[in-house]
Amino acid sequence: MTELIDGKALAQKMQQELAAKVNNLKQKKGIVPGLAVILVGDDPASQVYVRNKERAALTVGFKSETVRLSEFICQEELIAVIERYNADNTIHGILVQLPLPNHINDKKIILAIDPKKDVDGFHPMNTGHLWSGRPLMVPCTPSGIMELLREYNVNLEGKHAVIIGRSNIVGKPMAQLLLDKNATVTLTHSRTRQLEEVCRCADVLIVAIGQGHFITKQYIKDGAIVIDVGMNRDDNGKLIGDVAFDEVAEVAAKITPVPGGVGPMTIAMLLEQTYQSALRSTHK
């Protein structure tokens, strides 16, 4: 019988534990972790994500600041907002919600964030730490997936892990984290030939392509572990993953649902990294 990998339950457990750690830090050091979220424009999906992050931060006892800026803001003005938070000792994590309007260079915006406060883990300095085997700030979705695999006793050593999607946000950092656990990793993408055949070799399949119900059971070998990163809307507005859950669950050993799988863990890891940044600030 397929085991459901419940990201919502694990995220709630982690946030309860984190709230206790935050209270302890406040009592002993007088420090409250601070998270600043910057939203540019009024993209509906981004607004939902930002509200969820803000709500979660307040739940665990963080100081939470959200800046909502016009989609017409110039790049220099946005960088000035970031630099203000870089210099603010009460803020330990800075997150700029992506995507940004087309006239803003997201690479320059990421570079403007102090790497020590880059809780999304996108700054090249943090990418370098990850690829050199000394991770500091790691992209939240891949690190959340690793927590799920650990919680559900998935031993990655020697396993063949296949990732569909090569983004800097999920695919590439995911590959490195899996390599660090001695998995054999195949990173696939839109130009990969015979994708179905490659996927059927996977002991662990991680899907992040942004196409609803793209992966059917023909892609899955019996007993595989399937992690669905996708968040899509069907014709009725229902949230669905990249994996056709019902039919894939017939052959997979373990599988994440959408919603309630990877999504809650992404926010949990964002909070954890902000807390760790606050903790490091006490060691200066």
Curated annotation (Swiss-Prot):
- GO CC annotations on file: cytosol
Pfam families in the record? THF_DHG_CYH, THF_DHG_CYH_C
One biological process term in Gene Ontology: methionine biosynthetic process
Which reaction is catalysed here?
(6R)-5,10-methylene-5,6,7,8-tetrahydrofolate + NADP(+) = (6R)-5,10-methenyltetrahydrofolate + NADPH; (6R)-5,10-methenyltetrahydrofolate + H2O = (6R)-10-formyltetrahydrofolate + H(+)
Q: Where does NADP(+) bind?
A: G165, R166, S167, S190
An example Gene Ontology molecular-function term: methenyltetrahydrofolate cyclohydrolase activity
- What are the entry keywords? Amino-acid biosynthesis, Histidine biosynthesis, Hydrolase, Methionine biosynthesis, Multifunctional enzyme, NADP, One-carbon metabolism, Oxidoreductase, Purine biosynthesis
| Pathway given in the UniProt record | One-carbon metabolism; tetrahydrofolate interconversion
E.C. number? 1.5.1.5, 3.5.4.9
Listed as disulfide-bonded, the cysteine pairs are none
Q: Which InterPro entries match?
A: Aminoacid_DH-like_N_sf, NAD(P)-bd_dom_sf, THF_DH/CycHdrlase, THF_DH/CycHdrlase_cat_dom, THF_DH/CycHdrlase_CS, THF_DH/CycHdrlase_NAD-bd_dom
Q: Which family does it belong to?
A: Belongs to the tetrahydrofolate dehydrogenase/cyclohydrolase family.
Q: What does this protein do?
A: Catalyzes the oxidation of 5,10-methylenetetrahydrofolate to 5,10-methenyltetrahydrofolate and then the hydrolysis of 5,10-methenyltetrahydrofolate to 10-formyltetrahydrofolate.
- NCBIfam families found in the cross-reference section: PRK10792.1 (NF008058), PRK14179.1 (NF010776), PRK14186.1 (NF010783), PRK14188.1 (NF010785)
Q: Subunit details for this protein?
A: Homodimer.
Q: Which PANTHER family match?
A: C-1-TETRAHYDROFOLATE SYNTHASE, CYTOPLASMIC (PTHR48099:SF5), C-1-TETRAHYDROFOLATE SYNTHASE, CYTOPLASMIC-RELATED (PTHR48099)
Q: What is this protein called?
A: Bifunctional protein FolD
